[in-house]
Amino acid sequence: MFKKNKFQILFTLFALLLASLACTMNIGGPDYPETTIQPSEQAVKNMQEQFKAAFASAATSGDVILTFTEEQLTSVLHYRFAAQNNPLITEPQVILRNNTMDIYGKAKQGYFVANVKISVQVGIDENGEPTINVVSSDFGPLPVPEGINTTLSAIIKEAYTGAVGPVATGFRIEQIGICDGFMVMAGKVK
Protein backbone atom coordinates (compact mmCIF):
# COMPACT_ATOMS: atom_id res chain seq x y z
CA MET A 1 0.00 0.00 0.00
CA PHE A 2 2.88 2.37 0.80
CA LYS A 3 4.38 1.74 -2.67
CA LYS A 4 1.03 2.49 -4.33
CA ASN A 5 0.66 5.83 -2.46
CA LYS A 6 4.28 6.73 -3.17
CA PHE A 7 3.72 6.03 -6.89
CA GLN A 8 0.53 8.16 -6.93
CA ILE A 9 2.29 11.05 -5.20
CA LEU A 10 5.25 10.91 -7.59
CA PHE A 11 2.94 10.64 -10.59
CA THR A 12 0.92 13.65 -9.38
CA LEU A 13 4.06 15.73 -8.81
CA PHE A 14 5.40 14.78 -12.24
CA ALA A 15 2.08 15.73 -13.87
CA LEU A 16 2.11 19.10 -12.08
CA LEU A 17 5.69 19.72 -13.19
CA LEU A 18 4.82 19.00 -16.82
CA ALA A 19 1.73 21.19 -16.62
CA SER A 20 3.75 24.09 -15.22
CA LEU A 21 6.32 23.77 -17.99
CA ALA A 22 3.58 23.96 -20.61
CA CYS A 23 2.47 27.33 -19.28
CA THR A 24 4.15 30.66 -18.84
CA MET A 25 4.76 32.20 -15.47
CA ASN A 26 4.05 35.88 -14.81
CA ILE A 27 6.96 37.25 -12.80
CA GLY A 28 5.63 40.73 -12.07
CA GLY A 29 6.91 44.08 -13.18
CA PRO A 30 5.27 47.50 -13.09
CA ASP A 31 1.52 47.74 -12.50
CA TYR A 32 -0.67 48.05 -15.58
CA PRO A 33 -2.95 51.10 -15.87
CA GLU A 34 -6.24 50.75 -14.00
CA THR A 35 -8.31 50.95 -17.18
CA THR A 36 -7.29 49.01 -20.25
CA ILE A 37 -7.76 50.21 -23.79
CA GLN A 38 -9.09 47.66 -26.26
CA PRO A 39 -7.32 48.01 -29.60
CA SER A 40 -9.57 48.31 -32.62
CA GLU A 41 -9.10 48.50 -36.35
CA GLN A 42 -11.80 51.18 -36.36
CA ALA A 43 -9.59 53.47 -34.23
CA VAL A 44 -6.79 53.12 -36.79
CA LYS A 45 -9.21 53.78 -39.68
CA ASN A 46 -10.63 56.83 -37.88
CA MET A 47 -7.11 58.17 -37.39
CA GLN A 48 -6.30 57.72 -41.08
CA GLU A 49 -9.54 59.45 -42.09
CA GLN A 50 -8.78 62.28 -39.66
CA PHE A 51 -5.35 62.69 -41.27
CA LYS A 52 -6.79 62.78 -44.78
CA ALA A 53 -9.26 65.48 -43.74
CA ALA A 54 -6.57 67.52 -41.97
CA PHE A 55 -4.25 67.41 -44.98
CA ALA A 56 -7.10 68.18 -47.38
CA SER A 57 -7.92 71.34 -45.44
CA ALA A 58 -4.20 72.17 -45.28
CA ALA A 59 -4.17 72.43 -49.07
CA THR A 60 -5.63 75.93 -48.70
CA SER A 61 -4.19 77.12 -45.37
CA GLY A 62 -0.93 75.18 -45.21
CA ASP A 63 -1.50 74.50 -41.50
CA VAL A 64 -2.06 71.01 -40.12
CA ILE A 65 -3.13 69.99 -36.63
CA LEU A 66 -3.21 66.27 -35.86
CA THR A 67 -4.67 64.86 -32.67
CA PHE A 68 -3.86 61.33 -31.51
CA THR A 69 -5.81 59.59 -28.75
CA GLU A 70 -4.61 56.86 -26.42
CA GLU A 71 -6.98 54.42 -28.16
CA GLN A 72 -5.57 55.27 -31.59
CA LEU A 73 -1.93 54.93 -30.53
CA THR A 74 -2.64 51.74 -28.56
CA SER A 75 -4.36 50.28 -31.63
CA VAL A 76 -1.57 51.27 -34.03
CA LEU A 77 1.11 49.75 -31.77
CA HIS A 78 -1.02 46.65 -31.14
CA TYR A 79 -1.35 45.87 -34.85
CA ARG A 80 2.29 46.75 -35.62
CA PHE A 81 3.58 44.46 -32.85
CA ALA A 82 1.07 41.72 -33.77
CA ALA A 83 2.50 41.66 -37.31
CA GLN A 84 5.99 40.86 -36.01
CA ASN A 85 7.26 37.31 -35.48
CA ASN A 86 9.01 38.12 -32.22
CA PRO A 87 7.60 41.43 -30.93
CA LEU A 88 9.38 43.48 -28.29
CA ILE A 89 6.14 43.59 -26.28
CA THR A 90 2.59 42.32 -26.58
CA GLU A 91 -0.70 43.78 -25.33
CA PRO A 92 0.49 47.42 -25.56
CA GLN A 93 -1.33 50.16 -23.69
CA VAL A 94 -0.45 53.80 -24.42
CA ILE A 95 -1.02 56.43 -21.74
CA LEU A 96 -0.49 60.10 -22.63
CA ARG A 97 0.18 62.39 -19.65
CA ASN A 98 2.43 65.37 -18.79
CA ASN A 99 4.41 65.45 -22.05
CA THR A 100 5.23 61.74 -21.68
CA MET A 101 4.01 58.71 -23.60
CA ASP A 102 3.98 55.68 -21.28
CA ILE A 103 3.80 52.38 -23.13
CA TYR A 104 2.81 49.37 -21.04
CA GLY A 105 2.93 45.83 -22.29
CA LYS A 106 4.08 42.30 -21.64
CA ALA A 107 7.54 40.97 -22.47
CA LYS A 108 8.22 37.27 -22.79
CA GLN A 109 11.52 35.51 -22.23
CA GLY A 110 11.35 31.73 -22.31
CA TYR A 111 8.61 30.60 -19.93
CA PHE A 112 8.54 33.93 -18.12
CA VAL A 113 6.27 36.90 -18.81
CA ALA A 114 6.78 40.28 -17.15
CA ASN A 115 4.82 43.52 -17.22
CA VAL A 116 6.73 46.32 -18.94
CA LYS A 117 6.59 50.11 -18.79
CA ILE A 118 8.52 52.25 -21.24
CA SER A 119 8.36 56.04 -20.89
CA VAL A 120 9.21 58.08 -23.95
CA GLN A 121 9.30 61.75 -24.77
CA VAL A 122 8.44 62.82 -28.27
CA GLY A 123 10.19 65.77 -29.86
CA ILE A 124 10.99 67.24 -33.24
CA ASP A 125 14.25 67.05 -35.19
CA GLU A 126 15.66 69.78 -37.46
CA ASN A 127 13.75 68.32 -40.44
CA GLY A 128 10.38 68.54 -38.70
CA GLU A 129 10.23 64.77 -38.13
CA PRO A 130 9.21 63.21 -34.81
CA THR A 131 11.98 62.06 -32.47
CA ILE A 132 11.40 59.46 -29.78
CA ASN A 133 13.64 59.33 -26.70
CA VAL A 134 13.27 56.55 -24.16
CA VAL A 135 13.36 58.25 -20.75
CA SER A 136 13.00 55.06 -18.70
CA SER A 137 12.19 51.40 -19.18
CA ASP A 138 11.11 48.88 -16.58
CA PHE A 139 11.02 45.24 -17.67
CA GLY A 140 10.42 43.96 -14.14
CA PRO A 141 12.95 41.27 -13.28
CA LEU A 142 13.76 40.63 -16.96
CA PRO A 143 16.88 42.29 -18.40
CA VAL A 144 16.25 45.34 -20.55
CA PRO A 145 16.89 44.37 -24.19
CA GLU A 146 20.01 45.86 -25.76
CA GLY A 147 19.34 48.76 -28.09
CA ILE A 148 15.88 49.42 -26.62
CA ASN A 149 16.05 53.12 -27.52
CA THR A 150 16.91 52.48 -31.17
CA THR A 151 14.46 49.60 -31.55
CA LEU A 152 11.53 51.37 -29.92
CA SER A 153 12.22 54.62 -31.75
CA ALA A 154 12.21 52.77 -35.07
CA ILE A 155 8.97 50.93 -34.23
CA ILE A 156 7.13 54.09 -33.14
CA LYS A 157 8.43 56.10 -36.08
CA GLU A 158 7.42 53.32 -38.49
CA ALA A 159 3.99 53.18 -36.85
CA TYR A 160 3.69 56.96 -37.24
CA THR A 161 4.76 57.01 -40.89
CA GLY A 162 2.72 53.90 -41.68
CA ALA A 163 -0.40 55.34 -40.08
CA VAL A 164 -0.05 58.80 -41.59
CA GLY A 165 1.27 57.42 -44.86
CA PRO A 166 1.36 59.27 -48.14
CA VAL A 167 -1.14 61.92 -47.02
CA ALA A 168 1.65 63.51 -44.97
CA THR A 169 4.02 64.14 -47.87
CA GLY A 170 5.74 67.44 -47.19
CA PHE A 171 4.43 67.72 -43.61
CA ARG A 172 6.83 69.50 -41.28
CA ILE A 173 6.03 69.27 -37.55
CA GLU A 174 6.52 72.51 -35.60
CA GLN A 175 5.05 71.59 -32.20
CA ILE A 176 4.15 68.44 -30.27
CA GLY A 177 2.24 68.35 -27.01
CA ILE A 178 1.09 65.48 -24.80
CA CYS A 179 -1.54 66.02 -22.11
CA ASP A 180 -4.61 64.35 -20.59
CA GLY A 181 -4.86 61.43 -23.00
CA PHE A 182 -4.04 63.30 -26.22
CA MET A 183 -0.97 63.97 -28.33
CA VAL A 184 -1.26 66.96 -30.65
CA MET A 185 1.08 67.70 -33.54
CA ALA A 186 0.94 71.04 -35.29
CA GLY A 187 2.84 71.87 -38.42
CA LYS A 188 2.83 73.04 -41.98
CA VAL A 189 2.69 71.38 -45.36
CA LYS A 190 5.71 72.36 -47.45
PLM region spans:
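Short, charged/polar micro-motifs that form catalytic or ligand-binding hotspots
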Residues: 13
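Bacterial N-terminal signal peptides that target proteins for export
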Residues: 2-10
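Extracellular/lumenal and peripheral-membrane lipid-interaction modules
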Residues: 24-190
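C-terminal motif of bacterial Sec signal peptides marking the signal peptidase cleavage site
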Residues: 19-22
